[in-house]
């Protein structure tokens, strides 16, 4: 190892710190969105439920990543693994349902916005949802067998895809589009922008932690 190089342990610690910070930020984002929209807004409640599910899924995903990057296999019957395997498809389903509602609003012509911009937004959102689903599923499959190199490569590939999509979604959330609601206030820009940056940073650090994690030999 070259002098001054960051050790695998430090990459792992940085990734876990970023992921736990993202859990707290996701819960805070859900609460802020509900407060800003008002408790009578049904769509805001769905968005808050989405944030809550995302935080819970991330808690379990982070626990599995902590073991995986320490070369500790997770038994197939482990409670955290089973919980993540059971819940993340529900999070993806809720995200897809909310995405479909937005897409219907775009297609209805009720919004006086540029169709190209709406298409780009819908495409980025859908890509983000599918990439996150693949990231969750890839770790679920890889966690019991940290020595499985193809499973590790698949997880790395999806983390590599998810990072730029998280950044793109963050840009979409903070850059106003003419005809698509009013311009966000400074507080909202800060909240959504900070959450997006945390998501990107946590994803990139998780990618590096997996890349540098020890490779146990097959039994």
Regions from the PLM with identified roles:
Residues 43:
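Glycine-rich, often acidic, oxyanion-interacting loops/wings at catalytic, nucleic-acid
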